[in-house]
Amino acid sequence: MKKYFLFLISAFVVILDQFTKTIVRDSITLGETIKITEKFFWFTNVRNYGAAFSISFGNITVNKIVFISVTAIAVVLIFYLFKKSKSKIERTAFALIMGGAVGNLIDRVMYGYVTDFIWWDFPDFIMQRWPVFNIADSSIVLAITLLIIYSILLGRMNTEVK
């Protein structure tokens, strides 16, 4: 797989993420919810000053400094792992993580928060209310899922070879 193709994956995630967030900020009032399906899928416009699942330090300025710093370090680390990896699956996952991290980093730098807008509700499933998320978050979760499955399968293959 060409290295440039993987950078295109990251760029695509960033562009799609920023495009959808711009549409949401421009067309859905903050806090408004638009029903897509009757029971479990909505678009909404929320500002996430925290991290995943709205984890926060309670102070917007501290959040911004900490999360921008941590994300910037994570992007550098993911880029290093991306360059080091020989596996197409790992490289694809790292490209997805990089795109998601950069997409949310842009929001934090530009606005001081991340725009979240996708809201699923799975009644009686683990949580009272599923967190609102965005394309960047989805890309990161997809990549981590891919890495976990790949690691499990790779572990099984290594065990079978021995």
What are these regions (language model features)?
Residues M1-K162:
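Alpha-helical transmembrane bundles and membrane-interface segments of multipass inner-membrane proteins
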